[in-house]
Amino acid sequence: MPPPVAAREAIGDAKEHGRPGQSGIEKAQRSIERTLAFAAAMLSRLRSKRRRRSLSRTMTVLGWIAVMAICGYVGLTAMIYLTQRSLMYFPERTHVTPAEAGLPEATEVPLTTADGVQIRVWHVPPKADNPVILYFHGNGGALNYRVERFRQLVSAGIGLVGLEYRGYGGLGGSPSEQGLIRDAEAAYAFAVAHYPAQQLVLWGESLGSGVAVALAAEKPVGRVILEAPFTSALAVGERRYWYLPVQLLMKDQFRSDERIQKVTAPLLILHGMHDRVVPYAMGERLFDLANKPKHIVRFLDGGHEDLDNNGALDAVARFLAGDLD
């Protein structure tokens, strides 16, 4: 049935004036869809560019952070390498005589090492044929810091040859592993010029334990005492500076772990269980590596510098008397 006249006229009027029918609406919808799709594509493209720019900026920042971290690490490594001896040795540079320190029995004797450095020892002869302690102190202070210990030894009739290292106690020169060993050799030469080698007892305290082991590995002595000893200064450095290639950087490694098996004299190790400078485990390890006869005394409440307060001198007296054998 044909549409009513009014409807035909309306349709004809629409065609005449260009008003869209159903096909025009579809075209308009497609046009809108294309426009929206184009806008979405442009927006996506814009977001992608922003993401790329943001990612690029992030990568640039991370790159600079990495460069700065590498430069900082290299700089820190170089600084520690160049200043390592000042980090390892803490000398008291003031010269204090034995009398000023409170040990008037001691005579201060100047010595010259094989490499021409002037050093000195404090000398107190023993009573009768008592042992003579050839003493190597730690990396801090000087001989006068140990005067209370020396007084107790001397009052018991024990002799003393206390070594003051180069660079310590107002002396010239700079401390190093080779330098300290040469100092020890000069002190040993002085001691054996006055006493039989078997009368000598090497006592090395902390850093001095490395000196004592190095000397005892090459020279005959009666006994050796190691107080708070390390397996090596290298091991201490690796523990403290775990983030650095210490083995490649460290000059003065004091490898007691490699030298101890050449020591044949009776050995006593003293170590505090609460030592936070040289862990007790290092003393235990060095003891395991050492030859017999050997003894270790563990101080349950002892730290690094307080062993005299925990009975160290009593243990030394028993060792010298042969009561620990």
Predicted regions and their residues:
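Membrane-embedded segments
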Residues: 118-190
